[in-house]
Design a protein with these regions (language model features):
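Cyclic nucleotide-binding regulatory module and flanking cytosolic helices
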Residues: 2-38, 42-43, 87-88, 92-95
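Cyclic-nucleotide recognition modules
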Residues: 34, 78-136
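A cytosolic small-molecule/anion-sensing beta-strand core signal
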Residues: 42-43, 61-62, 83, 108
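Short phosphate-coordinating micro-motif centered on Lys-Gly-acidic
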Residues: 46-52
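Glycine- and acidic-residue-biased ligand/ion/polar-headgroup-sensing regions
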Residues: 55-68, 84-85
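Basic, amphipathic alpha-helical hairpins
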Residues: 124-127, 145, 168-175
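Short alpha-helical segments that sit at the start of domains
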Residues: 147-168
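Phosphate-/nucleic-acid-contacting segments
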Residues: 157, 166-226
């Protein structure tokens, strides 16, 4: 456990997307009446794993989490980082599949707040701005996902690779680590292994990624996108 002053809690909540725009009076009520859980994770300790039930809404207040996304067939995975302030998969808190779809592990020492479902429902009932912020967050993600099938598919192999990463990453910038064999990547991109090898070696010569056996490290996805 860790201790946090009332003033620090006010300031941290205002940084979170679900609390942006809430008045000072309402925020004072929320802090005084809401049962927050306080959590401290040391580096390398897991927060939640893929398929765990999403029974609490976690808010990353300080630190950085390592996020791991697995392919359904478990033949490859992508690792990336999520820095504070952030909310952990709020879109899975309600609906048909109320389970986390990624592993979240402390990359550095992390401080988090949590709310159980009854507290979230109470906030949704009592505070319009909180309700709108959550709806906006879920709606934006749904709108982005619904647009994906209609995008023009890239014909250039480099852009196909970038698109492959972007569709599977939680954030569109920063360091990404793809753990995949050359053969599986070729299959995913519908390209020959030789074409994949040429493309990756060119990107490595340009300093945009590094390769080792079964591991592709992209220091900055936004730079790779060009």
């Amino acid at each position: 456990m860790f201790f946090i002053t009332m003033l620090q809690l006010y300031d941290k909540l205002l940084e979170l997307p679900l609390f942006i725009g809430i008045s000072t009076d309402e925020l004072s009520d929320i802090v005084g009446q809401t049962k927050f859980g306080f959590h401290k994770l040391i580096a390398d300790k897991p927060l939640v794993s893929m398929d765990d039930k999403c029974t609490q809404l976690f808010f990353l207040m300080n630190g950085t989490l390592r996020v791991i996304s697995h392919a359904d067939n478990h033949r490859y995975r992508i690792e990336e980082e999520l820095s504070a302030p952030a909310v952990i998969q709020p879109e899975h808190f309600f609906g048909l599949m109320q389970r986390y779809t990624k592993d979240f592990i402390a990359q550095t020492d992390c401080s988090l707040l949590s709310l159980d479902k009854s507290e979230v429902l109470r906030l949704l009932d009592n505070y319009l701005i909180f309700r709108l912020n959550l709806l906006n967050s879920i709606s934006m993600q749904a709108q982005r996902m619904s647009h994906i099938p209609w995008r023009q598919q890239p014909s250039d192999i480099r852009q196909q690779f970038v698109n492959f990463l972007r569709l599977r990453c939680l954030t569109q910038a920063g360091r990404k680590v793809l753990r995949i064999t050359m053969e599986d990547l070729a299959q995913e991109l519908h390209q020959s292994r030789l074409n994949i090898s040429h493309m990756l070696n060119t990107l490595q010569r340009d300093g945009l990624l590094t390769m080792s056996r079964g591991i592709i490290t992209i220091p900055q996805l936004e730079t790779l996108r060009g």
